[in-house]
A protein has these predicted regions:
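Conserved glycine-rich cofactor-binding loop
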Residues: 17-19
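Conserved glycine-rich Rossmann-like NAD(P)H-binding loop of the short-chain dehydrogenase/reductase
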Residues: 32-48
């Protein structure tokens, strides 16, 4: 259960090496010790993340998670819940991919869709069952503004995240009244390892900025939040542009 200040005491980060996910963990605990479970592939980055959180005073567990293998996800979630109830689950894994390469490699595009959408559905349903059974908890699902209207320049990625976004929005409705809350977070361009070397977009933000928005959404039980906030209005315009006009935009 959350502590007396409303801070989650046990957090599961699916995508345990995600810079945004780790920033959310640090922002939500606000310096208070917590138990954090990092679910990711075994790697030096996962070990480094666990070491850093331990040094900050948290109890840290590591669970192997392979997004491309949905059949393994029930066991992954079982392992994550072995230590007790989870107060907050952060779904923060995904891949951006190379659009030009995927146009020539359908298998690569299918793998991206598996990671960004199929795996999100798989772990989302597992989490929903567990959290509903315990009667409390929250899910923060890390989507993207690209999900709102996929662009020609990244429609493979955007379409996979559109499915992810729609699933968690629907899951929020499914869980309404169960004691479990779901917030979907839609960042724009974020400076992380995943976007390194790519041309930045207007209103680019840092991982900490997304974390601030995510924690506010969690605390206020917002169903959807944009990072930065003004992107909500930008996307409202883009969503309603006529297709011939949208197609000509240099985005």
């Amino acid at each position: 259960m959350n502590d007396a200040t409303g801070t989650p005491q046990r957090i599961l980060l699916l995508g345990g090496t995600s810079e945004i996910g780790l920033a959310i963990v640090r922002r939500v605990v606000r310096g208070r010790p917590a138990e954090v479970v990092l679910a990711a592939r075994p790697s030096e980055r996962r070990t480094a993340a666990a070491t850093a959180l331990t040094a900050e005073g948290h109890r840290v567990g590591e669970v192997d998670f392979e997004a491309t293998a949905p059949a393994t996800h029930p066991a992954t979630i079982d392992a994550a819940f072995d230590g007790g109830d989870v107060d907050l689950a952060i779904v923060a894994f995904g891949v951006l991919g190379d659009q030009e390469a995927m146009l020539k490699d359908a298998a690569a595009a299918a793998e991206l869709a598996t990671v960004n959408y199929v795996a999100g559905v798989s772990v989302g349903l597992e989490l929903a069952g567990r959290l509903r059974s315990q009667g409390h908890g929250a899910i923060l699902a890390l989507s993207t503004v690209a999900a709102e209207r996929p662009r020609r320049s990244n429609f493979v990625y955007g379409s996979s995240k559109a499915g992810f976004d729609a699933f968690y929005s629907g899951l929020a409705d499914e869980l309404h009244g169960s004691g479990v809350h779901v917030s979907v977070i839609r960042p724009g361009f974020v400076r992380t390892r995943m976007t390194a070397g790519r041309e930045e977009a207007p209103m680019t933000v840092e991982a900490d900025d997304v974390a601030e928005v995510a924690v506010e959404a969690l605390q206020r039980r917002k169903p959807v939040a944009w990072a930065p906030g003004p992107l909500r209005w930008v996307m409202a315009v883009l969503r309603h542009l006529p297709r011939p006009v949208f197609r000509r935009l240099p985005i």
